[in-house]
Design a protein with these regions (language model features):
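Gly/Ser/Thr-rich loops at beta-strand to alpha-helix junctions
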Residues: 2-12, 53-54, 80-84
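Structural motif
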Residues: 74-76
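A structural signal for small-residue-enriched, beta-sheet-centric alpha/beta enzyme cores
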Residues: 47-48, 78-225
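Predominant activation on well-ordered alpha-helical scaffold segments within soluble catalytic domains
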Residues: 16-24, 60, 64, 200-208
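Active-site-proximal beta-alpha loop/turn segments in soluble metabolic enzymes
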Residues: 1-9, 44-49, 185, 189
């Protein structure tokens, strides 16, 4: 089963729904396909449950109900992420087998989608598409501090002070200072709509090829879209 925890009304968060629209769904065709095609594909289901702000239901509750009813052997969860470094935005596709916490990147902690809660293995796929204001300021401060350290004589008290600044402590301090002025501000690149489309194609193609043993990239490009 393939599911997502994204808000399709927000461009940088619409990665999941765009991937779902390109997944080769075959569960409803099981037993009705010709033998040669039946051997080439596996039963796959896909769902885009939305977010709690749209449905009023926890994404995890919807997914748990589906898992309990369908008993899939594997869940692939796709989500847009918040980057902790500005140079990571739209620059990496992250995968893990430890599940995903929908909304955690923007401060909305929801029910975990992991094996402990769902009872089946969960592969999480995510792409950082936004960054918060504190991270942007933190990255700028890092560049300034690196230049100051480079120009400061080693061994001096000022040098040691600069060198001893902890990354997480600095980030938390910046977030607390900016909080009253910017609130929960997140930004995304202006070309995010085109980037999300390309990323959705890459992820969907990869999932289709991985799940269906008889499907190649050439087949997808020829018949899918």
């Amino acid at each position: 089963a393939v599911c997502i925890g994204c808000n399709w009304n927000i461009t940088p968060d619409a990665l999941g729904p765009k991937v779902i629209s390109k997944i080769l769904v075959t569960r409803h065709l099981s037993g009705t396909l010709p033998v040669e095609i039946e051997k080439a594909v596996r039963p796959v289901a896909a769902v885009s449950p939305g977010v709690m702000g749209i449905t009023g239901i926890e994404t995890g509750e919807i997914v748990k109900g589906i898992v309990d009813k369908l008993h899939p052997s594997l869940l692939i969860a796709i989500d847009a992420l918040a980057a902790r470094r500005s140079n990571r935005i739209n620059a990496a596709i992250q995968m893990s087998d430890t599940g995903v916490a929908p909304g955690a990147g923007v401060g909305n902690r929801r029910m975990l989608l992991d094996e402990a809660h769902l009872g089946i293995p969960v592969i999480a796929i995510g792409v950082p598409t936004v960054v918060d204001a504190a991270t942007l300021v933190n990255d700028t401060m890092d560049c300034i501090l690196e230049e100051m350290i480079r120009q400061t004589e080693k061994g001096t008290a000022f040098y040691e002070t600069l060198a001893d600044l902890e990354q997480e402590e600095k980030y938390q301090m910046i977030a607390e200072i900016l909080g009253p002025y910017t609130g929960n501000l997140f930004v995304t690149p202006k070309e995010v709509d085109a980037v999300v489309d390309r990323l959705a194609n890459i992820i969907a193609n990869s999932i289709n090829i991985a799940l269906h043993p008889g499907i190649t990239l050439e087949d997808i490009n020829k018949y899918a879209w």
